[in-house]
Every structure is written in C-alpha cells, then in structure tokens.
Amino acid sequence: MPPDQMSVRFELFVQDMDQAIAFYSHILGFEVLRREEDYASLRNGTCILGLGPIAKLPEERGGYFTRSKLRSARGLGVEIVLEVDDVHAAYEHVQTCGYPIEGPLQKRNWGLTDFRLVDPDGYYLRITSRA
C-alpha cells in the first residue's frame, strides 16, 4: 500500500459519552461531526476520533473488545500523539480550562516540544509541536 494512501482515525471505548465528548471538544478542540446514543464522531484537522460506550460491548465474549477486558487500565502501553501548530497555545488552553496536566510543557531531546495528559477514561495523550 502506498504511504500517501493513509490517514488516521481512531476509536476509543469510554465509560461516559457526554464526559468524553466534552473533554475532546472543549479541552482539545475537536468538532462533533455526529452524535448518536451508541457512537460519536469528532474531528480536529485531519484527525478523526470515534467514541463508543463500553456498556454496549459484550461482557465476556463476542470480539476482541469486551467489558471485562476494559476493566483494567485502558490504553495500557499506548500513547496517542496529537500534533498541533501551536503547542504553547494548546498548553495554555488546557491550563486555562483547569484540566490536570501530567507534566510541564518542555522541549524534548529529540527536538519537539510537548506536554502530556490523561483523558477521563485513562487514555494517555501527548500533545506535541509539529517540528
């Protein structure tokens, strides 16, 4: 598959749809494209995010994702990296909203500036500069 054929879309299973939508729209600036009882689609730039309720998953069997599997730490071993044009403005916005930040804004050894936070469902996010 040619590399120019890809874009990113990711889906997260969440406990509280309203809380997750509020976080991604108010804190991270995603636009709600579609909202239904069992699914929401949001966009920021070329990044598409789907949200679905954990409660609608099967308890034990019925696919890779089940409620019993998601009772442990969600997103364990996964870091969702979101690139922004102005990481300083993004950091200030999150601070102004009063949302907890996992570490201060800092320039990393690899040359990018970033900060990290955890969404209401425990998914680990890194907000980073593009260059």
Predicted regions, residues:
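N-terminal first-folded block
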Residues: D18-L33, D38
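Vicinal oxygen chelate
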Residues: M1-R9, E31-D85, A89-V118, S129-A131
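Conserved active-site tyrosine of GNAT-family acetyltransferases
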Residues: A20-S25, V94, D119-G122
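Short, surface-exposed ligand-recognition loops at beta-strand->loop->(often short) alpha-helix junctions
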Residues: L12-D16
